[in-house]
Swiss-Prot record:
Coiled coil: none annotated. Residues 1-147 are annotated as: Disordered. Its main location: cytoplasm. This is Ciliary microtubule inner protein 4. Residues 35-49, 89-100, 127-143 have a biased composition (Polar residues). Keywords: Cell projection, Cilium, Cytoplasmic vesicle, Flagellum. InterPro entries: CIMIP4. GO terms for cellular component: acrosomal vesicle; sperm flagellum. It is found in: Cytoplasmic vesicle, Secretory vesicle, Acrosome; Cell projection, Cilium, Flagellum. Seems to be associated with spermiogenesis but is not essential for sperm development and male fertility. The gene is CIMIP4.
Length: 280
């Protein structure tokens, strides 16, 4: 039993080693198939158009389509199969050739994308032509800021070129007249001759402190407040409601004030006159 078990173990280990050697022999073939599969996926990724994002513009989509259409297909995958059985020197040569071919493909794709770019430049040129002012507005007298503010159609309907020219001519004529007027600065001799009468007056007259010569003034107090006013006065008793006094009552008040003022003045000036006479 022990020998058989030992023999069994030896056979098992030999079989296990044989399986490992077979797996090592199969590993390079698996690597080759995996490299072929990856190259296929890469080629498929290059040939299939990628979806554009939602926010991309129409111009970007057109450029992307042009690039995708004009990119030539990559070289066949047979080269990758042959590369497995070649030396490292031959592999380096193949890689250099593939790099040069990829550069040529990029150059051809860039040249093919130029007509697509030309199509995008078309609308921009048209927009510039539209933004440019028309020929009839280039030689117009009306400035562009007024046309922009009120609208070119409204300005053309309401104002003509002749009216604008007339208004501008009137402004220029007014400026010429203002410049042709004599300067207001005059010689001091002329000023003295013009204002000689004014300077002949005194300071009080020139300052307008009083207006003219003095005149005799007479008080109308005694002439207005006479007994005739009391005789001619009539009180309307029917329309006396809510009144405290009337014209007659006002007259009596003023008359009493006048009498009191006269008495006070007589007392004051009478005492002063008596004192002066006593001194002398």
């Amino acid at each position: 039993m022990e020998l058989g078990h030992g023999a069994g173990t030896t056979t098992f280990t030999r079989a296990h080693l044989n399986d490992k050697e077979g797996q090592q022999d199969l590993d390079p073939w698996k690597a080759a198939y995996s490299s072929l599969d990856t190259s296929k996926f890469k080629n498929q990724g290059l040939s299939s158009p990628q979806p554009l994002p939602l926010g991309a513009s129409a111009q970007g989509s057109s450029l992307g389509q042009c690039h995708l259409k004009e990119i030539p297909p990559p070289p066949p995958t047979a080269a990758s199969r042959d590369s497995l059985g070649m030396d490292p020197q031959s592999r380096s040569l193949k890689n250099a050739g593939s790099r040069s071919s990829s550069r040529e493909n990029r150059a051809t794709s860039g040249e093919g994308a130029q007509p697509c770019q030309g199509t995008d430049d078309g609308p921009s040129l048209g927009a510039q032509d539209q933004r440019s002012t028309p020929t009839n507005q280039k030689g117009s007298i009306i400035p562009n800021n007024i046309r922009h503010k009120f609208g070119s159609n409204v300005v053309d309907q309401l104002v003509s070129e002749e009216q604008a020219q007339k208004a501008i001519d009137e402004v220029f004529e007014g400026q010429k007249r203002a410049s042709s007027w004599p300067s207001r600065t005059q010689n001091p001799v002329e000023i003295s001759s013009v204002f000689s009468d004014y300077y002949d007056l005194g300071y009080n007259m020139r300052s307008n402190l009083f207006r003219g010569a003095a005149e005799e003034t007479k008080s109308l107090m005694k002439a207005s407040y006479t007994p005739e006013v009391i005789e001619k006065s009539v009180r309307d008793l029917e329309h006396w409601h809510g009144r405290k006094t009337d014209d007659l009552g006002r007259w009596h008040q003023k008359n009493a004030m006048n009498l009191n003022l006269q008495k006070a003045l007589e007392e004051k000036y009478g005492e002063n006159s008596k004192s002066k006479s006593s001194k002398y």
